[in-house]
A protein has these predicted regions:
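A Rossmann-like FAD-binding core segment of flavoenzymes
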Residues: 28-78, 85, 95, 102-115, ...
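Short glycine-enriched, charge-decorated loop/helix-capping segments at active-site entrances
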Residues: 21-26
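Beta1/beta-strand and adjacent pyrophosphate-binding region of the FAD-binding site
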Residues: 118-131
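Glycine-rich FAD pyrophosphate-binding loop
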Residues: 3-19, 148-161
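N-terminal Rossmann-like FAD-binding beta1-loop-alpha1 element of flavoenzymes
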Residues: 1-7, 133-144
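Short amphipathic alpha-helical segments
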Residues: 19-20, 80-84, 138-140
């Protein structure tokens, strides 16, 4: 009964953003592995290191399978195109977190492009963005040995209790403290970053 299911994954491990985008301290990867074991036992076939459209033509997929479901993660990021963006030392979360997760998993210290992992060890770190991804970066930076970590949020600090503008059952706009925030760092609200400043091609501050 049912259908035979094959999952194609571009990376070398199954799990997508759950495995490479979320830090180990927030989601232990053993839970993913356990679920994959269950799915494999139930008959799901997983094929890694397959880039559909590059390694495997879409025409072949459509010929060999009765249905094709597109479930790729959103790895494209929103940039901040302000003066100084080209300086070294400015990284996107989706550059930083996957490499840090690979190091945690015991993978080689260079990625598929030969680049070393980005580390916050011994550095003063500023995170632009006050959401969950920023908190993931904050916790990762602490674990890597950052000297200090500041997280900037463009919006004002939310209220301590549910705002009238977000009544039930809408998602409440409230001030929240994640486990990463409990470990330290400074959160700064109502900050609009307008320029990165640097010296000798490397970022040294922002305005």
């Amino acid at each position: 009964a049912g259908h035979a299911v094959t999952v194609f994954e571009r990376a070398d491990r199954i799990g997508g953003l759950l495995r490479y985008g979320i830090p180990e301290f927030k989601m232990e990867k053993r839970h993913i592995d356990r679920r994959l074991e269950q799915m494999t036992a139930e008959g799901t076939e997983f094929r890694t290191k397959v880039n559909v459209g590059v390694d495997l033509p879409v025409e072949r997929l459509r010929a060999e399978f009765d249905a094709v479901v597109l479930a790729g993660g959103a790895t494209a990021w929103r940039d901040l195109p302000i003066p100084g963006r080209e300086l070294d030392g400015i990284h996107q979360a989706m550059e930083y977190l996957p490499r840090a997760n690979r190091v945690q998993l015991g993978d080689p210290v260079v990625d598929e492009h030969g680049e070393p992992p980005i580390t916050a060890k011994g550095k003063k770190v500023v995170i632009i963005g006050g959401g969950d991804t920023g908190a993931d970066c904050l916790g990762t930076a602490h674990r890597q040995g950052a000297v200090s970590v500041h997280q900037f949020e463009i919006m004002p600090r939310p209220p301590e209790t549910r705002a009238p503008s977000t009544p039930w059952p809408t998602y409440p706009l409230m001030f929240r403290v994640s486990s990463a925030h409990e470990e330290g760092g400074e959160r700064v609200f109502s900050v609009n970053t307008e320029e990165f400043v640097g010296r000798d091609g490397r970022v040294t501050g922002l305005r």
